[in-house]
Amino acid sequence: RVVRTARKLDEISYDEMLELASSGSKVMQSRSVEFAKKYAVTFEVRSSFNHNPGTLVKEEVSYMEKVVVRGVAADKDQTKVIVSNIADKPGSAAKVFRALAGANVNVDMIVQNAASQGVANLTFTVPQADAGRVARVLKPVLAEIGGGQVAVHDRIAKLSVVGVGMKTHSGVAATLFQALADAGINIDLISTSEIKISVVVDLDRADEAVRAAHAAFALDKA
């Protein structure tokens, strides 16, 4: 629906499917893939509208590290939280995130910036469903560590590119960042793992960002 030239994958690894599922792809639930991986169950994801062959999800795939990026996903149900002017000392961040964990708030991308005069800023993302509770949960924590402010920004989306080939190929981040720059899309936050790069962009540019990344990695090519 977002990229008209998107094509079906014949196969994909458990790890890639897990990353896509947790990054906004609405194909599979993460827990289902985790269960299949745990018991080494190969399964097929098919369309409910036709009888065409689907995508096999399994441990090892034939392309493995030859193909750098296998998929692009956008999660539009994210909120950015900025906790500013907290004491820049050991334990401050731990107390903030311990409180959020105790309230079952799932934190994703995290950036800490040291500001001047002994204070720091924490920026992270949470699901929109949890955003309303963040300020309430952190109020007593901020009082304990000497103050701070909480600001919530909900007009964001998390764009992710996923592929096991990232393990052995350089330049993936540069390609993604250049594609977004060429489209005039600003990057807010950046997070990386072994097989995934995620960035936060403006919600209104999310679909455009998906198309730019899709084209940059030639995902419409067989």
Residue ranges: model-predicted function:
Residues 1-222:
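C-terminal catalytic "cap/lid" subdomain
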